[in-house]
A protein has these predicted regions:
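Sec-dependent signal peptide recognition
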Residues: 2-7
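Residue-level signal for mature regions of secreted extracellular proteins and peptides
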Residues: 10, 43-44, 64
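C-terminal motif of bacterial Sec signal peptides marking the signal peptidase cleavage site
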Residues: 13-16
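Bacterial signal peptide processing site
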Residues: 18-20
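Post-signal peptide N-terminal segment of mature Sec-exported envelope proteins
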Residues: 24-43
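Extracytoplasmic
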Residues: 32, 45-47, 66
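Mature extracytoplasmic domains of secretory-pathway proteins
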Residues: 49-116
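C-terminal partner/receptor-binding element of secreted or periplasmic proteins
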Residues: 115-159
Length: 159
């Protein structure tokens, strides 16, 4: 049983390894903590790029839950892309990274706000037991994209 738990723990750590690291800021020699900045490209909405800043503790079994996220439109967003996403109130997970060998995970979830024609990217940390559930939110308005114009045309056609 121990070997199985160790294998699962190590594999989840490898899932969190990212070659999308764009920044690494040391918080000091004696803290042994760094702020890592990674870029995330949404697989379904190719015109969106998010940057996530989170703290990594080098000699710790668990990284702090603090993180921030900033997402921007960096390319075209088409009606076909919006049609392909989960439009439920809970949206869908677009990124997941292990933050601890004790089942703590940072997730980024995409949620669509149809009334305001906006994509929301919610970064949060989950832990199977008690813990602090810190979160951060970034929005990407569809204003000025092909997806927004198509939505507006459909509303006018329905009237």
């Amino acid at each position: 049983m121990r070997k199985l738990l160790l294998a699962v723990g190590l594999s989840t750590l490898l899932i969190g390894c990212s070659d999308n690291e764009v920044g690494d800021v040391s918080l000091g020699v004696f803290t042994l903590k760094d702020i890592k900045i990674t870029s995330l490209h949404d697989d379904k909405i190719e015109g969106v790029t998010c940057h996530i800043a989170s703290i990594e503790a080098n000699l710790s079994l668990s990284d702090p839950s603090d993180s921030s996220i900033s997402c921007r439109q960096t390319g075209d967003i088409t009606p076909e892309m919006i049609a392909a996403i989960d439009k439920s109130k809970s949206g869908e997970v677009v990124f997941k990274q292990s933050k601890s060998i004790f089942f703590k995970t940072m997730k980024v979830r995409r949620i669509f706000d149809p009334e305001n024609q906006t994509l929301l990217y919610l970064s949060y940390t989950t832990k199977e037991t008690d813990g602090s559930f810190k979160h951060s939110l970034s929005t990407v308005p569809l204003w000025g994209t092909k997806a927004y114009n198509a939505f507006q045309s459909n509303q006018v056609a329905d009237q």
